[in-house]
């Protein structure tokens, strides 16, 4: 078992098209506050960004159950329930983990939706088009060009900033998972991203949304939050002028501090 620092543990879960490297600023900030910070990689993502771009075959093999089982195993190794934070697809995985009973509080940042959230803004269609335009992408790892990345992730960043972050963070994403998510609401039965929206035992959950996010716009965050009908705490916080890659955008410190303060306050009430 792990040795727990006085301040506790925070688990940061990355999304698609990036790796744990995308949390580098938040890791340093939270560690400076006395927290143990774990930023687990998806199965096969234990290598660097450059290696995944050179050989994306581990990405092609990804499944949602494999990712969530892996994350569950990571969280189970922590001595007391950690704070869970996730960005994009990582936000959906935070919701799935909370539904399984893990975590003292959860923060979902520009989160991908869980099953049943059927809102599809036009900006999301355009942002996801590189993956969805070709059904053959269901069996591939699909990357973005820089122009596509700039629209989907960094539309409020300068061109220079966007390119630097593209080169530092970008990796292909699983076409299979993305297609599965797109079709989830028309398939019968429970999908891989199913959660029990009436689960009264779930830890408090905060959705953080960037007002200018093209890939997972605020409308999705609000709709996802409204799906929860349990007696547990579910709140939404929106930041003006923020894009999808909120954890790396100028002013990220304000968001990181708010997320932590909210989680600390609501975790203590459990």
Language-model segments: what does each one mean?
Residues 103-139, 179-186:
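Flexible "cap/lid" loop of the alpha/beta hydrolase fold
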Residues 233-270:
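Catalytic active-site module of serine/aspartate enzymes centered on a nucleophile-bearing elbow/loop
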Residues 31-53:
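Conserved alpha/beta-hydrolase
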């Amino acid at each position: 078992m792990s040795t727990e620092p006085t301040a506790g543990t925070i688990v940061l879960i990355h999304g698609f098209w990036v790796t744990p490297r995308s949390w580098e600023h938040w890791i340093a900030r939270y560690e400076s506050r006395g927290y143990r910070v774990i930023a687990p990689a998806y199965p096969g993502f234990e290598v660097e960004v450059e290696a995944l771009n050179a050989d994306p075959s581990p990405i092609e093999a990804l499944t949602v159950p494999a990712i969530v089982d892996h994350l569950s195993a990571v969280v189970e190794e922590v001595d007391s329930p950690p704070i869970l934070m996730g960005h994009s697809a990582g936000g959906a995985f935070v919701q799935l983990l909370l539904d399984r009973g893990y975590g003292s509080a959860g923060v979902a940042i520009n989160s991908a939706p869980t099953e049943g959230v059927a809102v599809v803004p036009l900006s999301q269609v355009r942002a996801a088009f590189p993956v969805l335009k070709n059904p053959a992408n269901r069996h591939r790892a699909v990357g973005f060009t820089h122009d596509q990345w700039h629209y989907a992730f960094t539309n409020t960043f300068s061109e220079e900033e966007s390119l630097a972050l593209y080169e530092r963070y970008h990796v292909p994403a699983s076409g299979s998972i993305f297609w599965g998510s797109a079709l989830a609401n028309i398939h019968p039965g429970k999908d891989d991203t199913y959660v029990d929206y009436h689960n009264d035992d779930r830890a408090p959950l905060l959705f953080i949304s960037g007002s200018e996010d093209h890939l997972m716009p605020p409308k999705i965050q609000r709709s996802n939050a409204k799906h929860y009908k349990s007696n547990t705490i579910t709140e939404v916080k929106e930041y003006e002028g923020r894009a999808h890659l909120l954890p790396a955008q100028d002013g990220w410190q304000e968001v990181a501090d708010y997320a932590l303060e909210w989680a600390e306050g609501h975790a203590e009430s459990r």
